[in-house]
Amino acid sequence: GDDVKSACCDTCLCTKSNPPICRCVDIRET
């Protein structure tokens, strides 16, 4: 679970919430 969160926040925008919420965008569409 945490590993997925880390990977998500590593490439996506992460909100400064507690717990942090990852807002992933389709970077492949850029």
From Swiss-Prot:
Any matching Pfam family? Bowman-Birk_leg
Question: What keywords sit in the KW lines?
Answer: Disulfide bond, Protease inhibitor, Serine protease inhibitor
Q: Where is this site: Reactive bond for trypsin?
A: K16, S17
Q: Does the keyword Translocase apply?
A: no
In its UniProt record, which GO terms are filed under biological process? negative regulation of endopeptidase activity
Q: Which GO terms describe its molecular function?
A: serine-type endopeptidase inhibitor activity
Entry's Gene Ontology cellular component terms: extracellular region
The record's disulfide annotation reads C9-C24, C14-C22
Which protein family is named in the record? Belongs to the Bowman-Birk serine protease inhibitor family.
The record describes the protein's role as: Inhibits trypsin (IC(50)=17.60 nM) and, to a lesser extent, alpha-chymotrypsin (IC(50)=2.38 uM).
Q: What is this protein called?
A: Bowman-Birk type proteinase inhibitor 4
What organism, scientifically named, is this protein from? Lathyrus sativus (White vetchling)
